[in-house]
Amino acid sequence: MLEEIQVTKALNKIKATSRITLPYRWDLNIYRGCGHGCNYCYAMYSHSYLEKKEKYSSAGEENCAFFRRIYVKTNILEALEKQLGARTWKKEVINIGGVCDSYQPAEANYGLMREVLALMTEYKNPVIISTKSDLILRDHELLGELAELTYVNVAVTVTTMDEKLSTLLEPLASPPEKRFSVLREFKDTAAVTGLHMMPILPFLTDKPENLEQIISLAAECKVDYALPGVLYLRGETRKHFFNFLELNFPEILDPYHKLYSKGGADRTYKAELYRVLKHLMEKYHLSGDYMKPMETKLFRPRQLKLTDFLEEDI
């Protein structure tokens, strides 16, 4: 169900934390909720304060409002222009889609991203976009124009190359191969391209064969960096994902409870997983340095490397 809403501001400042230093301080979400239906999505919490959550049915079927009720911010352009045009705005990097995918199914009808990107081009404002949809190719030319003016980072998220598993985990996202086509297409622009290999799901997508296939394809696409991260479970996401496992992979439910006694996976598991990832990234000569391309384009001091993530839960 789509519901149109009005907002008073478009950009949200991210609260500083001691856990990790992000390369951006501002989020822009043109939708609230996401129709891709990824069963591990960390952003399910974003509906809770609206008191719009739907509880699981007695039959145990998923019935998550985050996937079913999508709020469309129809005046996002006006709100965004007001903030970008303010004298106090310093053209900081904006992360587009912090708690939703900006190219989710609703975007095919509303086309808000085209207007947003045109405005970003007018103001020459740097942006980061991560998606699981090849709908972003619709805006290839717009993003290419913006990338000639300032820093643009186009990243895709890939968790598995197994289409059957991907369809189960991420029902309405584009197939994995189509996501890689996005990376290939954007290499003919000045945009930075990246692979977000997250979340890696224990017992489902963490097999070395799957990790190597994804990393090797990213290398073929000549991405500027790859950023892996293991699954983190808390709040609504934890409840939803365990329910998903019970319905689809009951044999690994108990191992998950043991591995995730807290929000993050067991440290021993993570250490071994990142050892494998480090080896594979070295084998395929993939950089884990997220910040280097941004430094080059914007002349900003170094803040973040892949190694910063290895000790943290993503």
What residue spans do the PLM features occupy?
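Surface-exposed amphipathic alpha-helices with a cationic face
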Residues: 144-147, 183-188, 278-282
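Conserved strand-turn element in the central/C-terminal portion of the radical SAM core barrel
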Residues: 161-163, 170-172, 185-207, 231-233
